[in-house]
């Protein structure tokens, strides 16, 4: 069997996550860019997102972000619009929840935008609360049965 002469495996190539804790500068949209909220993930590096201008677009996740920045339904993203295709866009940046809150406070995002509530996970809490409500009977009602 040949000798293993490598310098480490998969975890060495990944590196350390020291940059995750650092705060980054807030990025505002420029010409040809728009904020959007992810509706659902489609696979193959694509997602469906509702842009702030009211258009539903098919978004392509860049190779730089692919498998490094995880995007889920409900996340706020910055997309670059295409000049030649209005129904498609490219994901430029995923906004962290605190950045999205700041943008909403600055008025960049509309007030009706729901933050930190994924389409798949949102709305289930209300249904769970109603499922745990019990019907209480008094002694008189039990005697009638």
Curated annotation (Swiss-Prot):
SUPFAM superfamilies: Nucleic acid-binding proteins (SSF50249)
Domain of life: Eukaryota
Biased composition, class Basic residues, residue ranges: 1-15
Key words of the record: Initiation factor, Protein biosynthesis
InterPro entries: NA-bd_OB-fold (IPR012340), RNA-binding_domain_S1_IF1 (IPR006196), TIF_eIF-1A (IPR001253), TIF_eIF-1A_CS (IPR018104)
Location of region: Disordered: 1-25
Family annotation (Pfam families): eIF-1a
Sample GO molecular function, one term: translation initiation factor activity
UniProt biased composition (Basic and acidic residues): 16-25
Gene3D superfamilies: Nucleic acid-binding proteins
Limits of the S1-like domain: 22-96
Disulfide bond positions: none
Xref: NCBIfam families: eIF-1A
Chain's role: Seems to be required for maximal rate of protein biosynthesis. Enhances ribosome dissociation into subunits and stabilizes the binding of the initiator Met-tRNA(I) to 40 S ribosomal subunits.
Protein family membership: Belongs to the eIF-1A family.
HAMAP family: aIF_1A
Protein name stated in the entry: Eukaryotic translation initiation factor 1A
Organism this protein belongs to: Onobrychis viciifolia
């Amino acid at each position: 069997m040949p000798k293993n002469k490598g310098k480490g495996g998969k975890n060495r190539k990944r590196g350390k996550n020291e940059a995750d804790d650092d705060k980054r500068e807030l990025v505002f949209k420029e010409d040809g860019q728009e904020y959007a909220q992810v509706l659902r993930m489609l696979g193959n590096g694509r997602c469906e997102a509702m842009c702030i201008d009211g258009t539903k677009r098919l978004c392509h996740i860049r190779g730089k972000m692919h498998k490094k920045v995880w995007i889920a339904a409900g996340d706020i993203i910055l997309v670059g619009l295409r000049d030649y295709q209005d129904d498609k866009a490219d994901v430029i940046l995923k906004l962290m929840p605190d950045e999205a809150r700041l943008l909403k406070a600055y008025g960049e995002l509309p007030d009706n935008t729901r933050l930190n509530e994924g389409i798949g996970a949102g709305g289930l809490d209300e249904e769970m609360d109603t499922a745990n409500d019990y019907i209480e009977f008094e002694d008189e009602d039990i005697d009638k049965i």
